[in-house]
């Protein structure tokens, strides 16, 4: 970022305004916002052309908060083991899914992704505590970083389950999951998982 905060420096005397940087050469980062104040710090919307940081955050605590949120979705898609390391496959899945989202909704796919994460992020969960040799489950608030992690996991799992033993390609499944989650639709796997976790937490208060 340049010292004036007006653009990104590409070298001496060369700057690019953020509104000129488009994800995949198509989608603008301008106007994309996070409505949930607790998640703003952990959803990285810094403009990038190509969401690939090469794992530079790996050895820093909480470094994943600096990874572009689109890349974090790609990383979640590189699971289970048979998909490990297939970043280009995940890249193509997300790129195609974003095209489908735009054709179906007319909205910026980056904003749809952010809404889906906000709606899918559980606010309460349960943890185990032991008193006198007896284990209890108690309700706890979920840290913002974990809320984002859980939301991305649910979205990726929902797309993967939809595409398993199904002629519908995973790109369409991911687009559908993101659209439904952004609307808060209970047909979304991510929304159902969030509500189930919060229901169990409520009963454990």
Swiss-Prot record:
Entry annotated with the keyword Lyase: no
Biological processes, Gene Ontology terms: translation
Signal peptide residue numbers: none
Domain of life: Archaea
Record's keyword annotation contains Kinase: no
PROSITE patterns named in the record: RIBOSOMAL_S7
Molecular functions per Gene Ontology: rRNA binding; structural constituent of ribosome
One GO location term (cellular component): small ribosomal subunit
Keywords: Ribonucleoprotein, Ribosomal protein, RNA-binding, rRNA-binding
Function: One of the primary rRNA binding proteins, it binds directly to 16S rRNA where it nucleates assembly of the head domain of the 30S subunit. Is located at the subunit interface close to the decoding center.
NCBIfam families attached to this UniProt entry: PRK04027.1 (NF003106), uS7_euk_arch (TIGR01028)
Binding partners and assembly: Part of the 30S ribosomal subunit.
Family named by the database record: Belongs to the universal ribosomal protein uS7 family.
Name of the protein in its database record: Small ribosomal subunit protein uS7
Organism from which the protein derives: Aeropyrum pernix (strain ATCC 700893 / DSM 11879 / JCM 9820 / NBRC 100138 / K1)
Gene name of the record: rps7
């Amino acid at each position: 970022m340049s010292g004036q905060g007006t653009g990104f420096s590409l070298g001496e005397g060369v700057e690019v305004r953020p509104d000129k940087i488009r994800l995949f050469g198509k989608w603008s980062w301008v106007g994309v916002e996070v409505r949930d104040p607790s998640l703003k710090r952990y959803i990285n919307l810094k403009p990038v052309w190509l969401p690939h940081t090469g794992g530079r955050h790996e050895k820093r605590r909480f470094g994943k908060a600096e990874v572009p949120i689109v890349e974090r979705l790609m990383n979640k898609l590189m699971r289970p083991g048979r998909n490990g390391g297939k970043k280009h496959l995940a890249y193509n899945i997300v790129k195609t899914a974003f095209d489908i989202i735009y054709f179906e909704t007319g909205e910026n796919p980056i904003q749809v992704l952010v809404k889906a994460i906000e709606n899918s992020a559980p606010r309460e969960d349960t943890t185990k505590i032991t008193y006198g040799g007896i284990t209890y489950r108690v309700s706890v608030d979920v840290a913002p970083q974990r809320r984002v992690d859980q939301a991305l996991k649910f979205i990726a799992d929902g797309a993967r389950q939809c595409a398993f033993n199904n002629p519908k390609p995973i790109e369409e499944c991911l687009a559908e999951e993101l659209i439904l989650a952004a609307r808060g639709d209970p047909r979304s796997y991510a929304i159902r998982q969030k509500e189930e976790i919060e229901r169990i937490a409520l009963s454990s208060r």
